Amino acid sequence: MKFLKRGVALALLAAFALTTQPAQAYEKDKTYKITILHTNDHHGHFWRSEYGEYGLAAQKTLVDSIRKEVAQEGGSVLLLSGGDINTGVPESDLQDAEPDFRGMNLIGYDAMAVGNHEFDNPLTVLRQQEKWAKFPFLSANIYQKSTGERLFKPWAIFTRQDIKIAVIGLTTDDTAKIGNPEYFTDIEFRKPAEEAKVVIQELNMNEKPDVIIATTHMGHYDNGDHGSNAPGDVEMARSLPAGSLAMIVGGHSQDPVCMASENKKQVNYVPGTPCAPDKQNGIWIVQAHEWGKYVGRADFEFRNGEMKMVNYQLIPVNLKKKVTWDNGKSERVLYTPEIAENPQMLLLLTPFQNKGKAQLEVKIGSVNGLLEGDRSKVRFVQTNMGRVILAAQIARTGADFGVMSGGGIRDSIEAGDITYKSVLKVQPFGNIVVYADMSGKEVVDYLTAVAQMKPDSGAYPQFANVSFVAKEGKLTELKIKGEPVDPAKTYRMATLSFNATGGDGYPRIDNKPGYVNTGFIDAEVLKEFIQQNSPLDAAAFTPKGEVSWL
């Protein structure tokens, strides 16, 4: 092989460099206005809450007004979602989130990240949701194992005025752990930060966008301290070339990302007050809490290839606070002026709401006190809701004890009448109740492993008929139904198919000889237990310190 002379080689390199520079369509020294709107973790809340908060009808009114305002100033809007459209409201869940995606179409979403809860249903349902949606589902790091091909588009390109904007989608690689393993037999979740580096290089080489934004479902953790969760947006931003993304539109941790100081979010953000987004390594990071409670608004000025944020706010969507007056009476009042609901959206969504509501409002039982299922409790401590759910599974399977991850409990039940809707809000995932017969030694090994799951994660375990003291990775005083575990005895454990197949990092038990899949859906099992045991006494299920960590 002959080598090119140095002068010829340099000339060719220079020519190649010239041909690979971005074909800039924007005008030099002109300032363009670009507004990025964003939501995340919608979780089925297409309709207003019982207090008249959020909902897609009010969201459309708000977004339409912002579009009009920005257009009058000569600017452009891009509307993104950080994912998790699925799971959380029965009227939506029973209809596979069809009303939610059709409502998002009407609002005019441009793209969304694929969230972990998009996999709460089989892939066939997810593909149907893609057909309903008129915007792309983006994820660069989800692959089909058998083909090595991506399951979704890695990015989408949008032109706003003369500016070429690339939007990358990324999904937490925790999905394989916290999702239903039965749906992931041929799916691989690669490390999103590593995939982002590759995609950014590909974009800059081939598409040559003026701006790159990531819409992600990875979580925001202060200073990158992600604990037992997979690394999130902060960690990724720090790992990328400085400023290689203009911003990250996030989701998954379900926080208002409003910084109190460097690397520390506000603990109790007050709706309607100023919100300072995070910035790491020259990359803005935003997140709009959950459920459509807010629409995030980031106003940028683009000039000569540079994106400068000039304004950011979280706009509450009819959020209310409870106020108690001097006479002892209380009411819920708006934080900010009311946003009217869009009539066209109401016309679209009302039939869906009525269809779902009719199936859910029938009373199935009652309880005399609160059954605690709030996220801030079930991921940190034992609760009476956990005990009720496991009692139902134990009763159905004839088990000696029960275990499940706290992240599978999604809501509380207030004192009073209980409807099927209440049950489905608590257990919306449609997991199957299973059981396994294990030796006492296997029980000790299993519970020792599960007890290592840390608080502040969905993996934190809820127990029933189990007591122990955990210290330095070992269990002492381990008892089942008040009796010390006999290594030679056989015990039956009830749990969910999700945990049995390794969900949330739990030891797999579906390969054990004594494993049985009952085929009964968790919410149906809980519903029948409530029907048979009502009125429930909430205090009878209150944990009494049976399990403790030192």
Pin down the residues of each PLM region:
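Active-site-adjacent helix-turn-beta-strand microarchitecture at beta-sheet edges
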Residues: 26-48, 78, 86-190, 226-359, ...
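Signal peptide-proximal N-terminal region
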Residues: 60-77, 204
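Short, high-confidence coil segments that cap the C-terminus of an alpha-helix
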Residues: 74-76, 109, 208-209, 398-399
